[in-house]
Swiss-Prot record:
Keywords: Amino-acid biosynthesis, Metal-binding, Methionine biosynthesis, Methyltransferase, Repeat, Transferase, Zinc. Belongs to the vitamin-B12 independent methionine synthase family. Its EC number is 2.1.1.14. L-methionine binds at residues 431-433, 484, 599. The lineage of its organism: Bacteria, Pseudomonadati, Pseudomonadota, Gammaproteobacteria, Enterobacterales. Binds 1 zinc ion per subunit. The active site is at residue 694. The keyword Chloroplast does not apply. Catalyzes the transfer of a methyl group from 5-methyltetrahydrofolate to homocysteine resulting in methionine formation. CDD domains: CIMS_C_terminal_like, CIMS_N_terminal_like. It comes from Salmonella agona (strain SL483). Pfam families: Meth_synt_1, Meth_synt_2. HAMAP family: Meth_synth. Its cofactor is Zn(2+). This is 5-methyltetrahydropteroyltriglutamate--homocysteine methyltransferase.
């Protein structure tokens, strides 16, 4: 039984973000659909060949997506919301883009579908919409076309499909309430059709992803797997694929299914390999997810070998990435600026493919010398002076309960803040960033490349900040921001100014659609050598009599949106960041900044996938935020911002943050998120987002007023703020001005209606 390698998926965007550039060029009308499709073909061919050359035996096909793989599955099934449909009922790539972003080069603009986090990652998917009596049919043959592409290139492949139960689990009911699980019988014929088409093409194995099987699912959902897979059995071999957690709690359900193999995540799960071997049917293949698909660290392959070697010869075995490599950058070899020692600790997607090949060869031969050689740098890291900072460890150990308490409760603070700021009813603000124009990006790039000296760079940034203040005053906003012209990314910027982080040149990963992020890497203990945001916040405040918010990214979000260390707990990392940013809050306050926003959009996404593990995470996550914020005086107003969240199940923790104002993303969900705050009787102030910044569509005054009136039915108007859903970094100035003008007008109308 020869052991094979495979990956669950590969990054789509390209080493130089070629897909992003092609998408945005097409959306802007600067290139043709044919040019976009050609870029996709070139990337797929390149990525298959790269994986093959790195030692992958079975290449994934179907992991490529033009926007998101869940959205691709929706189109595959003909699940297109009525507002996004073509007049003739056809489905094309512009249909896909209208669902994802609200508009495309053809067709009528319409509200984009909701977007939320993919399990507990920093990737976002487009939420499928379901309605009672809905019909499904095969309307989008992208998977079959890509299978034909790969076969024509002579590759040995493994098509990838998102499984039917997980697909339904990830969606939402729109319109008349009903149980969306009842649609399972209606989507299965489409899956049967697709599997039949794959069988016709000679496909032996299909990877069918059911990550919902790692969750604590209701019994009705667990019971749905058996009839679903009974219907799908028999056409090809099915590799039931799970990731992000272990499967042991749901193993009884899994082993009853008529599949031929199981993939398990042995990085993030607690599954015992010996127990899995004992309980799985003897003829099943086990795919062992031994290489972390969600991080950038080189694996200690000697440990991986020891973990799985006992099964060699006892059952069919593949070695794989824990999850899709979508969550990892592509290629470490192009990183030329990393310190040699630090670089030796890392492995990106292609290097992870190489790790799988090394592991396969050792397991097949019993020869481990190559594993020992590969693992030596990561073993040596444990003793590196770059990793440990005694002063940070001492400060962390000295934290007391008082460090996470504000001076007085919210009611007392609110009085002091009202007296200080004298804001009108329905106060208007934005979330932080303004459009990152070509000029701003060029300025930063020239400075980074050394083509611009520090003085000229600072002069340029100051001018953009000044213009942002002028724009906001002209629009009539009440609480201003400096616009974040100096920041490339809300996490990267702070990581660049904190010790304990390193950065890559090309370590891009997809966040959603064409949006890519370049997460910093936490390599050691974290501290703040100097103030980070104070200078620009102070400058912006000097330009206006209106309050300007200081803007910080919170500790949990910096943790979640970075590649973390693997040698300490996430709690330790979060609290180290909190202590560093606590000093930043104190410095902003001393500089005269009276409103400080600490963004925590990732608080919920960091939740463990199993609810039974939530309490411990929320306890330290909330404590980290409070350590960060609690140094502020009563008259300093602390804001926080959260997005893509379902709040109802963590309202206790949201309230425990004790932020004076929370701004949240609500427009895509039509303010339904406020139900959680109403039911909880949330005591502090709230800014429900009144328009979707992920879409270029400009909301009308009437639309915004209607949303605010709906909000006021749930939250007392005197505690409501008026703001967009999120930062405006990815928008252009024309639609930003138009949308904010309408937002301010709506707030003025409501004030006059009092």
């Amino acid at each position: 039984m020869t052991i094979l390698t495979h990956t669950l998926g590969f990054p789509r965007v390209g080493l130089r973000r070629e897909l992003k550039k092609a998408q945005e060029s097409y959306w802007a009308g600067n290139s043709t659909r044919e040019a976009l499709l050609a870029v996709g073909r070139e990337l797929r061919a390149r990525h298959w060949e790269q994986q093959k050359q790195a030692g992958i035996d079975l290449l994934p096909v179907g992991d490529f997506a033009w926007y998101d793989h869940v959205l691709t599955t929706s189109l595959l099934l003909g699940n297109v919301p009525a507002r996004h449909q073509n007049n003739d009922g056809s489905v094309d790539i512009d249909t896909l883009f209208r669902i994802g972003r609200g508009r495309a080069p053809t067709g009528e603009p319409a509200a984009a579908a909701e977007m939320t986090k993919w399990f507990n990652t920093n990737y976002h998917y487009i939420v499928p919409e379901f309605s009672k009596g809905q019909q499904f049919r095969l309307t989008w043959t992208q998977l079959l076309e890509e299978v034909d592409e790969a076969l024509a290139l002579g590759h040995k492949i493994k098509p990838v499909l998102l499984g039917p139960v997980t697909y339904l689990w990830l969606g939402k009911v729109k319109g008349e309430p009903f149980d969306r699980l009842t649609l399972l019988k209606d989507i299965l014929p489409v899956y049967q059709h697709v599997l039949a088409e794959l069988a016709k093409r000679g496909i032996e194995w299909v990877q069918i992803d059911e990550p919902a099987l790692v969750l604590e699912l209701p019994q009705a959902w667990l019971d749905a797997f058996k009839p679903a897979y009974d219907a799908l059995a028999g056409q090809v071999k099915l590799l039931l694929t799970t990731y992000f957690e272990g499967v042991t709690p749901n193993l009884d359900t899994i082993i009853a299914l008529p599949v031929q193999g199981l993939h398990v995540d042995l990085i993030h799960g607690k599954d015992d390999v010996a127990e899995l071997h004992q309980r799985l049917p003897v003829d099943w293949l086990l795919s062992a997810g031994l290489i972390n698909g969600r991080n950038v660290w080189r694996a200690d392959l000697t440990e991986k070998y020891a973990q799985i070697n006992a099964l060699v010869g006892k059952r069919a075995l593949w070695v794989a990435s824990s999850c899709s490599l979508l969550h990892s950058p592509i290629d470490l070899s192009v990183e030329t600026r990393l310190d040699t020692e630090v670089k030796s600790w890392f492995a990106f997607a292609l290097q992870k493919c190489g790790e799988l090949a090394l592991l396969r060869d050792a397991l097949n031969s019993g020869e481990t010398a190559a594993l020992e050689e590969w693992s030596a740098p990561i073993q040596a890291r444990r003793h590196s002076r770059r990793v440990h900072n005694a002063a940070v460890e001492k400060r962390l150990a000295a934290i007391t309960a008082q460090d996470s308490q504000r001076e007085n409760p919210y009611e007392v603070r609110a009085e002091a803040q009202r007296a200080r700021f004298k804001l009108p009813a329905w106060p208007t603000t934005t979330i932080g960033s303004f459009p990152q124009t070509t000029e701003i990006r060029g300025l930063r790039l020239d400075f980074k490349k050394g083509n611009l000296d520090a003085n000229n760079y600072r002069t340029g940034i100051a001018e953009h900040i000044k213009q942002a203040i002028i724009e906001q005053e002209r629009l009539g906003l009440d609480v201003l921001v400096h616009g974040e012209a100096e920041r490339n990314d809300m996490v990267e910027y702070f990581g660049e100014h904190l010790d304990g982080f390193v950065f890559t040149q090309n370590g891009w990963v997809q966040s959603y659609g064409s949006r890519c992020v370049k997460p910093p890497v936490v390599i050691g203990d974290i501290s703040r050598p100097a103030p980070i945001t104070v200078e620009w916040a102070k400058y912006a405040q000097s330009l206006t009599d209106k309050p300007v918010k200081g803007m910080l990214t919170g500790p949990v979000t910096i943790l979640c949106w970075s590649f973390p260390r693997e040698d300490v707990t996430r709690e330790t990392i979060a609290k180290q960041i909190a202590l560093a940013l606590r000093d930043e809050v104190a410095d902003l306050e001393a500089a005269g900044i009276g409103i400080i926003q600490i963004d925590e959009p990732a608080l919920r996404e960091g939740l463990p996938l199993r609810r039974s593990d939530w309490d411990a995470y929320l306890e330290w996550g909330v404590e980290a935020f409070r350590i960060n914020a609690a140094v502020a005086k009563d008259e300093t107003q602390i804001h926080t911002h959260m997005c893509y969240c379902e709040f109802n199940d963590i309202m206790d923790s949201i309230a425990a943050l004790d932020a004076d104002v929370i701004t949240i993303e609500t427009s895509r969900s039509d303010m339904e998120l406020l139900e959680s705050f109403e039911a909880f009787d949330y005591p502090n102030e709230i800014g429900p987002g009144v328009y979707d910044i992920h879409s270029p569509n400009v909301p009308s005054v009437e639309w915004i007023e209607a949303l605010l009136k709906k909000a006021a039915q749930r939250i007392p108007a005197q505690r409501l703020w008026v703001n967009p859903d999120c930062g405006l970094k990815t928008r252009g100035w024309p639609e930003t001005r138009a949308a904010l003008a309408n937002m301010v007008k709506a707030a003025h109308n409501l004030r006059q209606a009092k």
